[in-house]
């Protein structure tokens, strides 16, 4: 009997808040994030990113645009960390001197086995990060 070849599961992706904002506002690095953002079936969105992107869009583009982006983000899988992962994020923040949001978002990518797409240079030495510098 011939062996059945299974297709490998596509890798999950996570685009951080700055990446979302870069894409939806047509920034110079928007193309870097496009493939991951348009592949909604393999894209995870930390709940924290909903807040960060929503707030920035409200400030810079108003409620209608903010809500449109909020809806777009929810077409993907919105995820949250388990309590133990928050502790790991705190340790990572201390060890690597990361801001709280950066540590939580990086830990989310790690917990879900996703590649983190970012333009945040503070994450350049972290595992599982695909960086496009600003």
How should these model regions be labeled?
Residues 15-16, 45-46, 98-99, 120-121, ...:
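Histidine- and aromatic-rich ligand-binding microenvironments
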Residues 20-21, 50, 123-124:
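A generic structural signal for short hydrophobic patches within well-formed alpha-helices
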Residues 1-45, 57-68:
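Short, well-structured N-terminal submotif of metal-dependent ribonuclease cores
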Residues 60-64, 96, 132-134:
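Short, hinge-like loop/turn segments at secondary-structure boundaries
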Residues 1-10, 76, 106-134:
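Acidic, PIN/NYN-like endoribonuclease modules and their adjacent C-terminal/linker elements
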Residues 30, 50, 66, 86-89:
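A general structural signal for well-ordered alpha-helical segments in protein cores
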Residues 52, 74-95:
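Acidic catalytic patch
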């Amino acid at each position: 009997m011939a062996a059945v070849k299974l297709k490998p599961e596509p890798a999950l992706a996570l685009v951080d808040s700055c990446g979302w904002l870069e894409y939806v506002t047509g920034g110079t690095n928007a193309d870097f994030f496009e493939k991951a953002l348009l592949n909604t079936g393999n894209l995870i969105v930390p709940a924290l990113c909903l807040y960060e992107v929503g707030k920035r869009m409200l400030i810079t583009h108003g409620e209608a645009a903010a809500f449109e982006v909020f809806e777009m983000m929810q077409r993907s899988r919105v995820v949250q960390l388990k309590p133990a992962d928050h502790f790991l994020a705190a340790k990572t923040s201390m060890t690597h001197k990361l801001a709280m949001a950066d540590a939580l978002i990086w830990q989310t990518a790690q917990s879900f086995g996703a590649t983190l797409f970012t333009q945040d240079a503070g994450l350049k030495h972290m595992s599982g990060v695909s960086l496009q510098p600003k």
